[in-house]
């Protein structure tokens, strides 16, 4: 059976953008990469309850800009901006001699965000809710929010079974091989008493038409 390629990585440069936007020479590349990893882990751990979907990192000279996509921006910003200042001060200890700018972006439809759906299912599994119920409820909410299709997968000792297995549930269409298809992908882990359970979610949000077509239309109009 063929293995599934990461839907985001497959579409980078086609309809998706990089989550890290910076350039570095050989000497600094590894340091920047490790720094990015530490920043992402810290923000995710520190603001897990706020529902952080993804983090974009932009670098320029001695400045780092973070675009944090979250379902609950108020939880990160805090009262009078205290939360965001506290986060900035903590991050300043991770990155030395660099100014940090934090931009909070609200996720308008968290029910249709793959990463947030995966984390929600994982949280329910940790609360001992049946995995089938958790998956089906998430699928129903996603379809009501207006997505074209959704697929979920849970892997591990489901229901405390002796032998680990994987169960899939899906609704709508998920064209994984179509590059112009806007497929959102999320992964989370649930720590249960029987061990870890991996949760994967694919969400199809519709087709993104290539920009080249729009350019051709403009050329025809000008002719």
Swiss-Prot record:
It comes from the Bacteria. The keyword RNA-binding applies. Residues 39-108 form the KH type-2 domain. GO terms for biological process: translation. Keywords: Ribonucleoprotein, Ribosomal protein, RNA-binding, rRNA-binding. GO terms for molecular function: mRNA binding; rRNA binding; structural constituent of ribosome. It holds the Pfam family KH_2. SUPFAM superfamilies: Prokaryotic type KH domain (KH-domain type II), Ribosomal protein S3 C-terminal domain. GO terms for cellular component: cytosolic small ribosomal subunit. Belongs to the universal ribosomal protein uS3 family. Part of the 30S ribosomal subunit. Forms a tight complex with proteins S10 and S14. NCBIfam families: rpsC_bact (TIGR01009). Binds the lower part of the 30S subunit head. Binds mRNA in the 70S ribosome, positioning it for translation. This is Small ribosomal subunit protein uS3. It comes from Clostridium botulinum (strain Langeland / NCTC 10281 / Type F).
